[in-house]
Structure formats: C-alpha cells, structure tokens
Swiss-Prot record:
GO cellular component: phenylalanine-tRNA ligase complex
Gene: pheT
HAMAP family: Phe_tRNA_synth_beta1
UniProt organism field: Staphylococcus haemolyticus (strain JCSC1435)
Quaternary context: Tetramer of two alpha and two beta subunits.
Keyword set includes Acyltransferase: no
Domain FDX-ACB: 708-800
Residue positions binding Mg(2+): 461, 467, 470-471
Name used for this protein in its record: Phenylalanine--tRNA ligase beta subunit
Similarity comment: family membership: Belongs to the phenylalanyl-tRNA synthetase beta subunit family. Type 1 subfamily.
NCBIfam families cross-referenced by the UniProt entry: pheT_bact, YtpR
UniProt-listed InterPro entries: aa-tRNA-synth_II/BPL/LPL, B3/B4_tRNA-bd, DNA-bd_dom_put_sf, Fdx_antiC-bd, Fdx_antiC-bd_sf, NA-bd_OB-fold, Phe-tRNA-ligase_IIc_bsu, Phe-tRNA-ligase_IIc_bsu_bact
Cell membrane listed as a keyword: no
Length: 800
C-alpha cells in the first residue's frame, strides 16, 4: 500500500517529518518498506506557458517554442513532442536543472536552433509509464487549468511529496486505506483525525424509483446497496485527484472512474460504477453464476463462469463479476450521463477463488479477499456521491436502494487495566488505556474495573482481549516497556531430554544406513490426504488454500516422499534413500482440534551401496528396508514384531504390519507396481512408523555388555512347514522354549520347489546358544534343543 504524506494530511497532521513518521509506524508493527520522494534528484522544474510554436526549418518532427517561465523574457525551447502546441501550460526544466537519472539541462543547439531548457513528459520527471494518463503517454504533460508561469512544477503537480510504501501482513487489512492509516497515526501522536466529507445536496427524486436490488444468496452476499447520480459530466479529473492516484500506483482514466478508485484507496471499500442507461433494466439481481455462463469483462476478454462465481445481473444476464471486474457493456464511457454506484459485502472465499481461477487480480479483489469494514460500505458510497457532485456536476438522488444486512459495526471485548499491566509490564490507569482506544477510534465504556471496548469492523485482526493488550503496547510504545533483569531461582545445567537423545540416535542410525533426511510440506491435495493412512479418520482441510495441491493436512508422510523420490529419479539420481520425521493430522469432528501425531517414514529405491570402491552393490529389496527398521528398533532398545498385512497403495504380497507391545504402529512394504509406474519409479520400498508410540514405550538405557568369556554353541535346523507360516512365528516358538541360554536366531535360507510337497516350504534357522556364566555342555544344549524341536513339531513343523 502506497501512502502519500500530502494526502494523509487531509485527515491527520502528526506535525513531524515524514521520515520520523515512517520510523514510528514501523516500530508499532506496520513495516514501511520504502520511501518514495518525487522531489529527489529534481532541480529547477517550473511551469511554463507556450506563447508560440513554429516548425523547425531543418527537422520535420521538431518545433521551436517560445516559453514564458516567469522570467523577464521568454526562453526558446526546441521540442519534439507530438502534442506540443501554443497556449499550453507545461512542465519545463530550466537550464542548470536536473532530472531523475542524473540528467543535467544545458543550453544546446538542435539542428542549428538554440534550446534553453526542456519541456518534459511525466515519465521524464520520474513517473512510471504504467500510471501516466493515456492522453500524455506519448507526449508532454499539459495542465488543464491555468497555472502562473514560474510556479514550482512539483508543487503544481502535487508531487512535492513523499510516499510511504507499507509492507502489510494479511491481518492488517485496515491499513489498506488512507482512513485506516489516519486512525493509526492519530493514535500514535494523540491528535484528532478528520474523516472525509460525505454529505451531498440531494435532489427531490428518489433512487427507489430508478432501480431495485435483490440478493439470491445472503450467505455469499450479506449486503448490497446502490445509489444513483444523474447528469454527470465525463472529463479529466482535477490534477490533485490524478496526482493522488498516480502516487498510489493507479492510472487516471476520467473523473467518474477515478472517483471510484479514489474512494477505494480512501476507505478500503471497493466500489463499482455502472452506466445506468446500459444496465438493461431497472432491476439488479445478485446471484450465483450458472455453469458455462459467459460474460465479457472490462478487459474485453470473454469469461466462462462456474456456479461458485458471484455475478451482478440485470435480471437476465451478468453485468459484472462481483468483487473482481465489471462487464463491458455497462462500463462508464465518455457518453455516460447517469451512474449507479455499487457498494457491497461479498464472501471473501468466493471472491478469492474466482479471482485465482480467472487470473484476475485487482485492488478490489485483494480487499474483498481480506474482508472489508462493514462500517464503511454505505459511507464510501456516500463519499463517491459527494465527489461526483463536486467533480462531475452530478445530481445525487435521495435514498439508497439496498438488500441484506450489514450486521454489527462493532465487536465488544471486556478487559481490565490490571490484565493489561500484568501482561506487558506497564502501570497504566483506566483513563490512559481508554485514551489509547479512543485515539484508535474504538468506543469504550468503563463499569467498575471492567473496560468494554467496542472494536470496529475495520479491525478484523482484533478478536480477543490479548489483541487489545497488543494494541495498547503498540500505541503506548514497545520502547516504554520497563527493563528488568530476570530473577533466577535454582540454576540447573541444560541437557537433552530423553526424546531428544533418542531422536539424535535415530537420525545417526538412519544416516549411517545411507538415508538422507527430508523435510516436506504438511499440506497435500485432497485426493492424496488419506494415502497410506493406517487408520480411518476425518481429514482437515484449509478454508482458503493457496492451491489445490496444498489444500489438506496430511495423514501420512509418504505422498511427498514419493514425489521427492520421483523428482530425483527423473533427474538421473536413481539411487534414492530418504527419511522424514514429521507430524500428521487426524480430525476429531466439527469444532474439535485435530490430533497431531509424529511419524517416522522412509523410502528406498535403486541400488544399495555397500562398498562403492569395491564395486559391491545390491538392488534394494524388502529385507534391506526391514533391516533399516530392525536397526532402528535395536538402537532404541525396542522389539518389533511383524505380520503380513495389506495397505492401500502397497504390494499386497510384500507388505508387513509392524507391531510394538501388541499395538500396530506402522508398516513396511513395496510400493504397488501401479503406484510406482505412475511415478516413473522402479521397485521402491517404504516404511512408516508411529514415532510418538515408539517414544511412549519405557525402556532402560542400553549399557555396555562384556564380550563373553565362554564359548557358544551353534546348531542349525531345517523345518518343513506350510508355505503360509511366517518365519517370525517359528522364531517366536524357538525363543519361547530356549530358556536362558538361547541368545539369538537367524533365518538363513527359505526354499520352495523341487523335492518338496506342494504348498510346503523349507526354512533353515541357525540357533546360537551361550551361557555368560559357565561353559555349555553338550548335554545341556541338547536338552534345550530337543525341547525346541518338540515344540516346533507340536505346531505342525517337520524336522528335515
């Protein structure tokens, strides 16, 4: 938002230099990103009057002008502008003057004729071509009224000014207007703020006889009003209006269109001007667009509408796209005489979706998207009527034609001085706090010790008492907060929490296994929000997503990890191993906060490098992925169990559910071939674990264990079992019967095929026996070993 200091003084005069004002505003939370000084680098720029013009004898495109610049004698200036003519008041840079870009004005001869100065265009004095009026886009600027020759040109142009550029956060939409900024400045400097004049002289004719207004969907359009102004004269706006629009970054068009833009900047309330004679009826109907309905907007583009768009219609066809852009056949033109002024409240979400879908961003749509002040809707329309009367000789009809309800202009919030002072460390009285709120334009009432503050609708960022406390701190001054040293009790040395220790260990383990940490977005598309979710829970969607691809909070980390892997593989990085620790979100129904759960996920594809210098590589498979998960469990002193399972999006025969203490906490598996193909991936393996559940298991610290002093005994067994019996089940039976001397088991071979009965498989398992206190005897080992074999046979296994 560009704030002209010259314009701001119409409403409030802080009595300080603009640099000091900018510094003060920045310290209170609105960042002044830049300062534009139109007088910088300009010297000896005056208004000149062209007394005569003659063609240059040796150049067809040059003219010799005699120009009165307020000195004893006129000066001769050679000018090549196509629109230069005698009788014009123009901008002249005198000899010895300077223009932006380091241009120095010197006496010169052009094709043999002396030239003592330069007749300037607006671009040559530093105005951007984007905002120069069309009439002067390719030539010099000509004043529309008489100005005394020799007058300082910047003063005559209302450009002897400094403009502050605000870098506003989304919550401070109130500062997107001159009036909103004036309230802020008045509060900062404890001075009075003067509002713009809105009272016009109305005719005896009523606008209710000219048109009617109907709203079809009050949820999308809570309020719509219109006023009628007759017999306007279309002409260029006065120079002061044009200058203020230019300084705000808007190109002047004509007085009627300029007034709608002027009031937009003044109040932050978008208006639209219709040519009443081209609306096509006396009826205005605000409705949802019909699917496939079309209209041509002011930029001469035909737009195809959808049923979520809001349109202003004449009862039959659209005449404007609500809050975004008007239609072409009802626009104000040079022939317009009667004007209908629209002021309305539109649903911010609908306006934003329409604006984004059609790629139509405007000053109006950006304000509707952030929400407008209901208190200013009718006031802004009245202001436009007043200006049309003053600047376009319009006749303002009585009454406004409206439909809907503006709602409350204020939101009451109770607060106490004790709460304010306790929160921010001030020692302010009720009177001082009330004074701050009154300067901000907030009405207050004090009852006992409770102060009720009526927050106006323009301050949509203030909804709770803490917001009010922030306002007190901002306006009174953060610099005024008393400084004090903290009081410390017993000081303890800092250390990592148990969870932090485990997380560090986990990261070291995964990175040691060759995985790289990834950090991805928490938002996914609605279509992928439930991909790979272990539990069926409601999703959480954003009210105003920036894009459809980031519209819903994730329930798994894998969708974005798959995207990241596909991105790398597409760029010739085919061996990808990533992990992520991040939060997922599960809904709890309307009005309830979601559950946030931390997950650990990983993805592996390509080849797994063992010793790159020896050329030893192996393709990543299920067991490598499982080995990574097993290593995590070992390092965290956890014991995972696995069972075959099915997860949507994973290979149905190569997926295992991971359990911890009887609770399913995740899975390991190969991506379903179709999912892999959709992402241009070869065989890819993933795992996802509930990290919060892992951290909740109480485990002791892993202490150092001495190397055994006594030798162990190893025995191998081969078992014939049904092919659907998992190896983990066999290992569990072995451990349940191995007593205290069975140290570990290892499945080292699985065979199905020739020499085995159909539906059977052979599983070879190595058993490691060890007694840390004594040497094992063959008799003792055999006794335990036989017990294990009997237990296996009892469960249907055949010893081979």
């Amino acid at each position: 938002m560009l704030i002209s200091n010259e314009w701001l003084k119409d409403y409030v005069d802080a009595g300080v230099k603009v640099e000091d004002l900018a510094e003060r505003i920045t310290r209170t939370g609105i960042e002044v990103d830049d300062m534009i000084d139109y007088s910088k680098d300009i010297k000896n720029l005056v208004v000149g009057y062209i007394q005569s013009k003659e063609k240059h004898p040796d150049a067809d495109k040059l003219n010799i002008c005699q120009v009165d610049i307020g000195e004893e004698e006129p000066v001769q200036i050679v000018c090549g502008a196509p629109n230069v003519d005698a009788g014009q008041h123009v901008i002249v840079a005198k000899v010895g003057g300077r223009l932006p870009g380091g241009i120095k004005i010197k006496r010169a001869k052009l094709r043999g004729e002396r030239s003592e100065g330069m007749i300037c265009s607006l671009q040559e004095i530093g105005i951007s071509s984007n905002v120069v009026p069309k009439a002067y886009e390719n030539g010099i600027f000509v004043f529309q009224t008489e100005v005394e020759p020799g007058t300082d040109a910047l003063t005559a142009l209302y450009l002897n000014d400094q403009v502050m550029e605000f870098d506003l956060t989304p919550n401070r939409a109130d500062a997107l207007s001159m009036v909103g900024t004036a309230y802020e400045v008045a509060a900062l400097y404890q001075t009075e703020m003067t509002k713009p004049e809105t009272q016009s002289n109305e005719t005896s004719e009523s606008a209710t006889n000219e048109l009617s207004v109907t709203i079809d969907n009050p949820e999308k359009v809570p309020y719509y009003s219109a006023r009628v102004v007759k017999n306007v004269s279309i002409e260029p706006s006065p120079i002061w209006v044009q200058a203020r629009l230019i300084k705000a970054g808007i190109r002047p068009i004509n007085n009627v269109v300029d007034i709608s833009n002027y009031v937009l900047l003044e109040y932050g309330q978008p208006l639209h001007m219709f040519d009443q004679d081209h609306i096509g009826s006396k009826e205005i109907v605000v409705r949802q667009a019909k699917d496939e309905e079309t209209m041509t907007t002011l930029d001469n583009n035909e737009r195809k509408l959808v049923d979520t768009d809001i349109v202003i219609s004449n009862g039959q066809e659209p005449i404007a796209l609500a809050g975004v852009m008007g239609g072409d056949f009802s626009e104000v033109t040079e022939q317009t005489t009667n004007v209908v002024i629209e002021g309305a409240i539109f649903d911010p979400v609908s306006i934003r979706h329409t604006s984004r879908r059609l790629n139509l961003r405007s000053e109006a749509s950006s304000r509707f998207e952030k929400g407008i002040a209901t208190e200013f809707v009718d006031e802004a329309v009245d202001r436009a009527c007043y200006l049309l009367q003053e600047l376009a000789s319009g006749e303002v009809l009585q009454d406004r034609v409206s439909s809907g309800d503006l709602g409350s202009f204020v939101t009451p919030i109770d607060i106490t001085a004790e709460k304010v002072n306790k929160t921010i460390g001030f020692n302010l009285s009720n009177d001082e706090i009330q004074s701050i709120f009154r300067q901000l334009g907030f009405e207050t009432t004090l009852k006992g010790e409770t102060l009720t503050v009526n927050v106006p609708s323009r301050r949509k960022d203030i909804t709770i008492k803490e917001d009010l406390i922030e306002e007190v701190a901002r306006i009174y001054g953060y610099d005024e907060i008393p400084s004090s040293l903290p009081v410390f009790g017993e000081v303890t040395s800092g250390e990592l929490t148990d969870r932090q220790h485990k997380t560090r260990t986990l990261k070291e383990t995964l990175e040691g296994a060759g995985l790289n940490q990834a950090i991805t977005y928490s938002l996914v598309s609605k279509d992928h929000a439930k991909d790979f979710a272990l539990q069926e829970r409601p999703t959480i969607s954003l009210l105003m997503p920036m894009s459809e691809a980031h519209a819903t909070l994730r329930q798994s980390l894998l969708p974005h990890l798959i995207e990241a892997t596909a991105y790398n593989v597409a760029r010739k990085n085919k061996d990808v191993r990533l992990y992520e620790i991040g939060r997922v979100f599960f809904g709890n129904g309307e009005g309830e906060l979601p559950d946030e759960v931390e997950y650990l996920s990983g993805i592996l594809t390509g080849e797994y490098v063992v010793n790159a210098w020896q050329g030893k590589k192996e393709e990543i498979d299920f067991f490598i992925a499982k080995g990574v998960v097993d290593r995590v469990a070992e390092k965290l002193n956890l014991e995972f169990s696995y069972k075959a399972g099915k997860i949507e999006g994973l290979h149905p025969g190569r997926t295992a559910i991971v359990s911890l203490e009887g609770q399913d906490i995740g899975f390991i598996g190969e991506l379903h071939p179709q999912v892999a193909a959709d992402n241009d991936l070869k065989r890819t393996y993933v795992f996802e674990l509930n990290y919060d559940a892992m951290m909740q298991v109480a485990v002791g610290y892993i202490n150092y264990e001495q190397i055994p002093k006594f030798p162990g005994v190893t025995r191998d067994i081969a078992l014939e079992v049904n092919h659907d019996v998992p190896s983990s089940e066999l290992k569990q039976i072995i451990h349940n019967n191995g007593e205290d001397i069975l140290q570990s088991t290892l499945v080292f071979d699985v065979y199905e095929g020739e020499h085995l009965e159909k539906g059977k498989k052979s599983v070879a398992i190595r058993l490691n026996y060890l007694d840390t206190e004594d040497t094992l005897t063959d008799e003792r080992v055999s006794k335990i070993h036989d017990k294990i074999l009997e237990a296996l046979q009892a469960q249907g296994a055949t010893i081979r």
